[in-house]
Every structure is written in C-alpha cells, then in structure tokens.
C-alpha cells in the first residue's frame, strides 16, 4: 500500500497521509493512516501525490516550506504551509501562513520539506483492472501476500481481492500494467492453485509431525493388507475405517495407499487391537478331503452357506484341479476363505469340526458294511426279527438257522438243491429209521443199475439226484410222510415186519389179479388214482399240473410232451398238508404195467446190444424187488428213471414169480430196505 499513498487535503488546509483503496469515476476511496478518520471517498481535486522521497532539501531563510505538525492533540500530524523566518544551526523559526494571526514555532530540520509541487490527481492518474476468481481460489486470493509476485510483475500499485464482487482488483498508475494483467492473469490463478495445494500439504505435514510427536509415546500398530483386499479393508465409503476410528481410545488411523500399510495409534493396546480387527483382511485356505467335498458343500450349498454365515467370512472359493497357486496335498481340495483374521479363525473351527464329524460318520458306515460282509460270509445268520420292516430285512441270514429257532422242521432253502451230504428232511416221521432204511443190498442194486446205464443217462440221473429230497414227501415208500397205512384190507409193510417168515410177495397178489392185457388201460387206471391227489400248483403263478413224472414209475413222457430227462423237475410247492393219513391212501396198487415198458421202451430194447440184454436179465429179479420196495423214494440214493427201466428186460408175471421163488430168501432180506 506504500505505492498508493496519497495526500488528502483537510478542511484546515493541511494535507494528511492516506491510501487509495479504489478508483471511481470522479473520486477515490481513501483510507487514512491509523484510521483517525473513517474510510471515505475523496474528490480528485483534494488528492495529490506525495513528493518523491529522493528530493534534495535546501532550505534558506525566507523560503516557503511545509512543516509536519498538528493543530491539536486530537488530530494527527499533517503538512502545513509555512515560511522560514530565521535559521540558527539545525533549528528553524517558522511562521504558519494558514493562520490569520502570525504563529511562530521553532522546529528541527527533519520536520521541514520543500513545498510539494504535485498537482491534484485526475481520472487518468490511475488505471484499474479486474480478474474473476474461481470459487476454489477465493479464500486464497483474500491474502494479499499471494499476489506479491504478480503485483511486481505487472507493475501494479496495488492488487487485492474484492469479496463483494469476487474479483481480483489491480490498481496502477501506468497504462502498461493493464496489458500485463491480461497476459499473466491465467497463469497467476494456476500458480495460486498449485501453491494452495502445496500449502495444504505442508499444513497437513506439520499437523502430522505434531501428532507423531504426541503419539510417539502412545500405543500403535502397523500392518499391511494385500492390494486386492484393500477395498474390503476400507469398506463401502470408508465404513470400516470410520468404524475403527469410533473405537474408544483410538487417536489416529493412517493409510498408505501405495504400500497398503495401515498405522493405528491409540491410548491403549486393547483399543489398537480392536481397531486392527476391523481393518486387517486376509486370505487363507483349509484342506478338505476329496471324498468329503460334496458333504461339506451340502445340497444346494446349504452346509457351506451356513458355515459362511456363522463365521462371518466375506468370500469362499474352491480351488480347481487345474489351479496350482496353492500347495495341494494328495486327496485334498483347498477351500479358500477371505475375511478378517477373526472370521478366518471361526471358519477354521467350524470346518474342522464338520470334517471330523463326517469322518466319524464314514467310519461308522464302514463298520456297518464290514459287519454286513461278515454276515454274508458266515451265511444266512440269525434274523433279528421276522416282523421287521423291509429295510430291516436287508441282512442275508441262513434260513436253516432261523427255522431251528422257530421249530424242529428244517427249511433249507426253497429251491432245488441245497442238499448237504448229511441232509435230513424234517417232514419224515422217525427220521432216523428213514435214514437207515436203505440197506447195503439196495445200494449194491442201485450201483448195478448205474453201471448198466449209459453216459447220458448217468448225467441225467446225477442231475435228478442232486435235486432229490431223500425221505421227503414220498407217497409210496416207507420213508415218506407216514402215509403207508393199510386201507380196504390190503397188505402193508407192517404185516411183513410182524411176520418175517411169511411170503413177502403176498403184497403183489392184489395187484396182479387186476392186470389186463391192455397196458395202456391199466396205465390210465393207475394214473387216474394218482391225479386225484397230485393235482397241485407248483407255484402261485402256475396252473395245476399232473405230477406224472415224480409219482409214476412208468411215465416216460409227461403231460407237456417233453422227455423227463430233458425237462427240469417241477418245483414243489410246500403247501400245508395233513401229516397223518391212511397208509393205503398214498400207497398205490402195483400192476403189471409198472413193470412193462411202453412201446417206445420196447423198440429201444430191441436195438440194444446182446451183452446189455444179458446183463439186464441177470438183474431182473433185483429190479422187480426194487419196484415193489421203497427204493423209488430212497432216502439218500438216486431214483431210477424211465430210461433205466427201458434198459431192463420185460418179464411176465409168471417169470417174475419163478425168479422170485429161486431167490426168495435173498429178496426177503432186502425188502423195503429192512433186514
């Protein structure tokens, strides 16, 4: 403001020092020194420029001078017009010309100056320029020190910011200043903006320095966060940092974005650690066995979602087989979790517990499978309960063991076979007698029949023998189901056992008397009696069939037209039947047709070699006794088939009686397997 100093004439004629603040059309806004008068507008004619400071002072007696003095104590000093009357050394006697009466005063040389020759200012004495200031720079432009270099560059007398118009005002006494202002104004504003930024950083640095000095003796922690997790650490709109700053005892939280480093300062260690728990986000992985991955995820991700919700982790990711970023163990799949350290610890506890639970469940399941496998290897073990549900019947147990618990009867399988070498049916009465009813002679006779049979027939017999049930459900032998009682006055095996000396062939008398020449007729009569009791359904789905193959000895072709050797024996239906019947009901009368083969068997016999026929004749007596005895349903021996009988020579009743008389004693001993 020194450059805009002017002298304003007062009402008493003295000139007082003032400063130009603004330039108007016909006046100037002047501010007085020390504000002894308020700011006011002064016309141009009452304002003049001060003299140059380097003017040479040469004062002699009689010269007009200006004296720096004041009229009273209330007014400041001003330049008054006076005249030198006397000089004596450095002291001057002056006389004021402004006063009506002469007023003399002795003053020193410093208070004197020559008369100011400058005239009053005019409109063209000052030049004014304005520059609009942006809003962000208005506060900075209010400080006149910011425009110091700009003022010097443009040659302005004064540069200041006008708050009402938001403009930068440049006042100058030179016209060239206006041109310079137009050139440098934009650059000046940019420099102000740059300086403002630097100044603000310096201020922050100063504050930080002061804060650091204060916190040097306090608690602080420093930790790094990965760049990809920095967004999670800061939070949405800095929510995590704000939450950490709200922790009681936290004085400052600093973040270095370049290195991802957090610095937390607080009054206590607990407060600092708590604030750190909000900001420290990490990524960690947990190894999960491959066979348990599906169970850890759960149906529709239910299990893993529950773990994530309870632990508080932000993300979960399953490492793929083609990814090799993380170390992988054999048979393990890494589960990658992202969250705070506390969240990672929570998810680790939950996941380890769940994996341990799944392993225990798997171990129990394997033990269950091992027990099941042992039960299968032992075979058909004890059933826990026959009333159990279908799911409880999944264990395979042995039916024979279960049947032994239920009763004395043995049901060893419901199919064909499953006959052990010591198999004994529970259907027979007096099973011990039934098992021992076969004598050595009968076995020899069966062996002889076996030797006479061909290879094909032997195989067929072996197959049938493997399916036979010794002592089970026979209708004609004594080893059957106790149905050999007499009926209608007919002879029975009991009469033979009571009187061993009697003729055993008396059992055949009733049957031979009813023979006829027509073999087919007797055959049909023989089968008619059996159909009454043999029409039984093999299974629930099959219709009733004639049990011709198993009930008759001379039936070589069954009712379906298939040879017995080619067809599998029908599966017997184990129906409940009365165990005790009359012996005569099951026992059938033996006729000549039982010992005479059909026409097919006769034609087959004619084609046999002579040696086979001769061997058959030698054994005819034994064959006859086997037909009348219980050999058809022997307990443990094979059953003769129609093919075996076809190989035997046919005999008449007379020849059979003669042969029986010759070996009567021998046959009596082996009749029905009882000696």
Curated annotation (Swiss-Prot):
Disulfide partners: none
Q: Which residue windows does the record flag with biased composition (Gly residues)?
A: 473-488
- GO biological process entries: animal organ development; dentate gyrus development; membraneless organelle assembly; mRNA destabilization; mRNA transport; muscle organ development; muscle structure development; negative regulation of inflammatory response
Where are the annotated segments for RNA-binding RGG-box?
A: 470-485
Organism domain of life? Eukaryota
Which SMART domains does its entry note? Answer: KH
Q: Which GO terms describe its cellular component?
A: cytoplasm; cytoplasmic stress granule; intracellular membraneless organelle; neuron projection; nucleus; presynapse
Enumerate the subcellular locations listed in this protein's record, separating them with semicolons. Cytoplasm, Cytoplasmic ribonucleoprotein granule; Cytoplasm, Stress granule; Cytoplasm
Start and end residues of each stretch annotated as CC2 domain? 353-379
SUPFAM superfamilies reported in the protein's UniProt record: Eukaryotic type KH-domain (KH-domain type I)
Write out the ranges of the annotated region (CC1 domain): 201-208
The GO terms describing molecular function are: molecular condensate scaffold activity; mRNA 3'-UTR AU-rich region binding; mRNA 3'-UTR binding; mRNA binding; protein heterodimerization activity; protein homodimerization activity; RNA binding; RNA strand annealing activity
Keywords of the record? Cytoplasm, Developmental protein, Differentiation, Myogenesis, Repeat, RNA-binding
Which part of the chain is the KH domain?
Answer: 222-251, 285-314
Q: Basic residues compositional bias: what residue ranges? A: 527-537, 570-581
Residue stretches making up the Agenet-like domain: 4-50, 63-115
Q: Where is the composition biased (Polar residues)?
A: 649-664
Locate the compositionally biased regions of type Low complexity.
Answer: 403-413, 429-438
Cited Pfam families: Agenet, FXMRP1_C_core, FXR_C1, FXR_C3, KH_1, KH_9, Tudor_FRX1
- Regions of compositional bias (Basic and acidic residues) in chain numbering: 608-631
Compositionally biased residues, Acidic residues: 511-521
What task does this protein carry out? Answer: mRNA-binding protein that acts as a regulator of mRNAs translation and/or stability, and which is required for various processes, such as neurogenesis and muscle development. Specifically binds to AU-rich elements (AREs) in the 3'-UTR of target mRNAs. Promotes formation of some phase-separated membraneless compartment by undergoing liquid-liquid phase separation upon binding to AREs-containing mRNAs, leading to assemble mRNAs into cytoplasmic ribonucleoprotein granules that concentrate mRNAs with associated regulatory factors.
What does the entry's free-text domain comment contain?
Disordered region at the C-terminus undergoes liquid-liquid phase separation (LLPS) for the formation of a membraneless compartment that stores mRNAs. CC1 and CC2 domains are required for homodimerization and FXR1-network nucleation. CC domains also mediate interaction with other proteins containing similar CC domains.
* Recorded family membership: Belongs to the FMR1 family.
The name on file for this protein is: RNA-binding protein fxr1-B
> Organism classification, top ranks?
Eukaryota, Metazoa, Chordata, Craniata, Vertebrata
